UniProtKB/Swiss-Prot annotation:
It comes from Ajellomyces capsulatus (strain G186AR / H82 / ATCC MYA-2454 / RMSCC 2432) (Darling's disease fungus). GO terms for cellular component: plasma membrane; vacuolar membrane. The gene is DAPB. Residues 1-21 are annotated as: Disordered. This is Probable dipeptidyl-aminopeptidase B. Residues 1-16 have a biased composition (Basic and acidic residues). It is found in: Vacuole membrane. InterPro entries: AB_hydrolase_fold, Peptidase_S9_cat, Peptidase_S9B_N, Serine_Prot_S9B/DPPIV. PANTHER family: DIPEPTIDYL PEPTIDASE 10, ISOFORM B, PROTEASE FAMILY S9B,C DIPEPTIDYL-PEPTIDASE IV-RELATED. Residues 121-923 are vacuolar. Glycans are attached at N135, N351, N574, N815, N902. The lineage of its organism: Eukaryota, Fungi, Dikarya, Ascomycota, Pezizomycotina.
Amino acid sequence: MATEKGHGRDDEERVPLTRGSTEFRNSIDSFDYSSSTASLSLAVIDRINNSTQDAALGEKGPRDDDDDRYWDDDVEYDVEDADYIPSGGKPMHKSVKIALWTLLFLSLGGWSLAFVLFIFRSHDTYETPISSEDNISSGGLRGDRITLDDVLGEEWMPRHHFISWFPGPNGEDGLLLEKDGPGSTGYLRVEDIVSRKDTKSSKGSIVLMRKNTFTVGGETVICSQVWPSPDLKTVLVLSEKKQNWRHSFTGKYWLFDVDTQTGQPLDPAAQDQRIQLASWSPQSDAVVFTRDNNMFLRKLSSKEVTTITSDGGVDLFYGVPDWVYEEEVFSGNSATWWAHDGNYIAFLRTNESAVPEYPLQYFVSRPSGEDPNLGEENYPEVREIKYPKAGAPNPIVDLQFYDVRKGEIFSVDVADRFPDDNRLIIEVLWASNGKVLVRETNRESDILIIAAINVLSRTGKIVRKEDINALDGGWVEPTQSTRFIPADPSNGRPEDGYIDTVIHEGRDQLAYFTPLDNPEPLILTKGPSEVVNSPSGVDLKRGLVYFVVAGNEPWERHVYSVKFDGTALQPVTNVSESSYYDVSFSDGAGYALLNFQGPKVPWQKVISTPANENPFEEIIEQNNHLSRKLRLFSLESKVFQYINIDGFSLPVLERRPPNFDPTKKYPVLFYLYGGPGSQTVDKKFRVDFQSYVASTLGYIVVTVDGRGTGYIGRKSLSIVRGKLGHYEARDQIEVAKKWAAKPYVDESRMAIWGWSYGGFMTLKTIEEDGGRTFQYGMAVAPVTDWRYYDSIYAERYMHTPQHNPQGYDSSAISNTTALANNVRFLVMHGTADDNVHIQNTLTLLDKLDLANVDNYDVHVFPDSDHNINFHNAHKIVYTRLADWLVNAFNGQWLKTNNPTPNDSLFRRAATWAGLSYNFKHLH
């Protein structure tokens, strides 16, 4: 659940409680790519345009009649969930039928007239307090409505080109790797972005691999991922990739020679054994790899493999992280770092022998790929995972070093470091001349130390220490974005240094520390805007730092540059427009891939940076297919604004249905994530489940980034520490009250939903609210007690349970009386969720059982992990959400409380069965 600030959650399930992707070993494959108010006439048009929608939601759409939104209990109607369909009453009298048919024709005539007037009348614009994005679609009233299949598939997904910048072997800037594009001359190529000319030939690129397959000893190798060596002479190839956890995987590794276009096993003596991790030396002369949790070294000058460690195994990891470090610290599968000169390798030794195990059961599949023993075919496969829950023993991590020339392992003691059971190592950064910076925190992640180690002298010291808890009551997020700045006296840099993100005047800002042991930095950025996962690029020749900020408003992203001395702050993107950009820079930062991500149709182009004397610009993607679709469909409009709650100005996004009419009454769905440092209110282009709810179902969707979320200041962020859910739930409820008071909102039909942390927040909100504002909630894969979640994440925001038992008690979902006061809520969870264990949902169900609470529905997905996608589950989970929401706003769930038999139906059934019964008992 590690939340990376600034990571937009395009897909609710994709980055639930966990961080976004981080760059991994320069792999070209490692890019991660996230109505009740509608008139009858509109509903008819929707039926014509979207027959597939009917299949998903059933024949009956949301009612339009605000005064009679809930149908009488004794009237038969057709909805998908047959368990909740009351039986019909007596047959109608003929005169009643005639009267009803007459009324129906008169009503249709009236609706038709109203429909014509609605089309041709002049529409008033609804004013927004801050900024309103006009509906980017131009389909208008007659435009198609998106279907659930549309948003679950790739119909509305922007195309992204997977460009991987590559440092030239001779210092060239602007080189990039490309794979298998249209009309390409080879599977893997390196190109000069400007000249598109190859220094070896006139073909415009250097072809590293002509095909994505090759043969070794009669075995056909199919590339899964590829990593060229820094000198571009050899390609490290992964085949037969098999996923392990979210970021880790195993496979077979090969060395592919560019000149001969032939391959060989990375380890010729163990060709068929699966490897967990492999990475190039900076000099291209060796590959270090981990297999069965032990480390090995293969030098290209020999086919022999050197064993670095031999005692690795089930409880001892070398060079790769265990589950919790993979998930919550590195967001990746590597804990190995080469020194720049290739003479040393730093790596983590992780001992998790004391970490308790959690069993994951697989009832349908067998992820191990192994056949069960005879007679055990009908038993679930069980995978034990070392998972440290809050307060439980953590894995013990040590930083060790391998001297490549001497072939020996050593460690360096540093005085006053955290003890083994109170230490997290969150970043390792090589400097020059055998120096390495190590970022560590205590177990509760609120005290930061930076240690400088010299592997040549095998000495080390603490050069910087910050008590974040004392500073603002907050914590340290584990990031790996610190940049080493080498000394260059000719360019005004007499000493080595590094650029880091620090807390300055209540915001995250960039700071330059030089020399390495100087704890007092030069602050490079100031003001109300916060930097995001920065620095993004460094131009050492020109002395410039490039970075991304949450612009004038927190929902924006813009790119800036500043000099190493903090002067000449300049925007790279057009800051006069409220936009959302992302960027990646070439190795020398002379060029950049600029990604415009919204609010309009995304595009990509390669540009020269402003300091580059040779201007260059090339558009590589315009997403014309999305522009065409927008002309055909009617999508929601978006309103961005701030709402003040308890003195905090909170970003709010309101999605309004097409042809929004402020004189009507709309149901409202709140969608949230809300995890610490996260952001959901942003200006990215996205057509997602929320778009479907607003555009097709015709409901208003509101998203609030409450206290605890990112980019609205440290004061707002840190206040949630130790009491997760308290302030966040209050913010959702208070904003919901403001929406309930709006003239266009039906306050009796309000729901809230979220996934993962958002699932926790859904339950916490309806628990705190007790049915006073929200009537419905939908929680997917929720945490229900932070004692059940992993230690590194939970303790960062809640302290340990031993330190803060009352905080854990109050944050747990436990007030069953309050939950019973809601009309109904839905909980869904995957049984094989390795992140948020189904234990969370099951223990909540037990509390509800003990309290005799039954106003909820549960859907369990066998063998699905946190993403819920096993055996068609991905589609089912969203179909279930949509159907359940429609039934809720149709008043369907009001009929499930204290159900009684239909008198006339029971009489008929009893008579048919020849039974006698005292019907007075029914009254």
